[in-house]
């Protein structure tokens, strides 16, 4: 399925309740685009004292960052973290390294324009060639989602490395991701199932299109990350690929876990 994509692709899926999963090209670095906004939000909540009050500046910026994926909000939150976008990016990188995300880099701000049991093989099968800038992998982004899910229960690597990120903070961020306004990607097919909820954060630029998130179903929850790159431009075929990966994973986990 992924090997048939006309471009470079990678994916990682794992049941967080059963532990089984699969991966392809999961350690290949892709231009990160907006996927790292999830890491920005996580870092802000780890530093902020308590959940931002509704309507406060930080609450408003976080909502703009996650729900419509606003670049100006991302830059404002990086400045909030440490006085500038570059210094704020350093803080985000520090958080990612603290939980073992070694193949992701937050490189400055965004250009604002108007308009669990059995190890899953993680390797580089086909890495895209691109210039300097933000990058991440399907493996790293799914690890961040897994860490947030664990943190929502008060456990896991984020709680250990960032005690300021409370279970309530993590649940607040997950709630925001449940309200993302975006063209269907991971939720292309599984989103039609009324017993399924998808919490996700996508990212896209002209040459790259990704989606990563959590899929909750009546029998459990799984994490999924699908990344695509094509030097001459990506299209909605990337969204359909993400949708097929999520649908296949859900079908498999339902069969295995009941």
What are these model-derived regions, one by one?
Residues 38-42, 71-72, 90:
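A generic alpha-helix surface/boundary motif
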Residues 26-31, 66, 130-135:
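A glycine-rich, coil/turn loop motif that links secondary-structure elements
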Residues 45-72, 86, 98:
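Active-site-proximal loop and beta-strand segments within enzyme catalytic domains
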Residues 18-28, 58, 122-126:
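Glycine/charged-rich beta-loop-alpha catalytic/anionic-binding loops adjacent to active sites
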Residues 19, 29-53, 65, 224:
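Active-site SXXK
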Residues 1-9, 14-18, 78-258:
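Penicillin-recognizing serine hydrolase domain
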